[in-house]
Amino acid sequence: MMQTSSVLMTGAGNVEMHLKCALHFIKDLGYLCRPPDSMFSRTLVNRFAMVDVVHAHLRFRRPLASFDFFMYQENEKLDHGDPAFREMHGCDQRVLCFLAEIAVLSAELLDGSTTRDLVQAKAYTLETEMRIWGHKYYNSMIRGASISKTTTQASSSSPSSQPSPMFLSDISILDIVCECFYWTAQLLLLRRLFLDPTKSSRVQLVRRHLFQIMDKLEPGCGPDSSLPFPFYMAAREATTLEERDWVRRKHAAMMAVYRDRSREYMMEYTEKIWNNAVSVAISNASDDTLSWCTPREQYIRELDKQSTYFMF
């Protein structure tokens, strides 16, 4: 599992091989069914679970660990142990469970092992669970939308350039990063299970809110080191020049602090996705269908499947 950090920083190597070796190691030790006793072992299992789920989303596949892996089942104690999963990765363990289930259902949809109707029926149930668990975040979204409504048209389409001290006094930096992961799970639910296109109002509502709360995080504040996955997943959904320019500025600011090659690769692929969206628009190809058979969606899937970038 420590080798994954080397891949992250250098951008060289095959993280898939390291993950498979780690899975066999964890399985042989019996840690798929129960938490380890030692702190060091718990740290490695926590790391594996996070890397496995994030990598599954980056490659449009199931997590390597089966869905009955104890880390993919709700266990509030894991966020309060030593080490606490939440503090270690900036993501609540329950949100990790949501992300794992979304990855599994998305893979079933793509490989045809489950019908679209059944996958989306399960997605509705999952969405209900996610909304109930994350109800505390919805007032934040309403406040953000209210603030945007009272500002200029330009600022309503792109985040503000300055953090809000009042906002940060109400909530810790770690809480903001955890909220980013929650809304990223909502975004992936919409895009990969309900098959909403980028331009759908629901996708753009979540994307705007993610940009707003990410804009509150100063690069180098600590927990924001966990931000790449939410940031680059949301960045793909930017549609206007203002939004994309904000992404570029935020990326540059984070790169000045966290100099890992994987961020460079993710931004490079984000630019490719944006450029492809422009090409599709010029060719009059429709992006308003719920089907993932459009050239744009096929392009994104193939781009990710063939890529070597990695983050967690």
Where are these regions (language model features)?
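TPR/TPR-like alpha-solenoid helical repeat scaffolds
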Residues: 40-49, 122, 148-149, 265-277
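Short coil/turn motifs that N-cap or connect alpha-helices
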Residues: 35-36, 222-226, 258-263
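Acidic/serine-rich, low-complexity amphipathic helices located in mid- to C-terminal regulatory regions
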Residues: 3-107, 297, 301-304, 312
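Contiguous, well-ordered alpha-helical segments that form the cores/surfaces of helical PPI scaffolds
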Residues: 1-8, 24, 46-54, 182-193, ...
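Cytosolic regulatory protein-protein interaction regions
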Residues: 63-223, 233-256, 270
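Acidic, Ser/Thr-rich low-complexity linear motifs
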Residues: 34-40, 173, 262-268
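Intrinsically disordered, low-complexity regulatory regions with latent secondary structure
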Residues: 157, 251-312
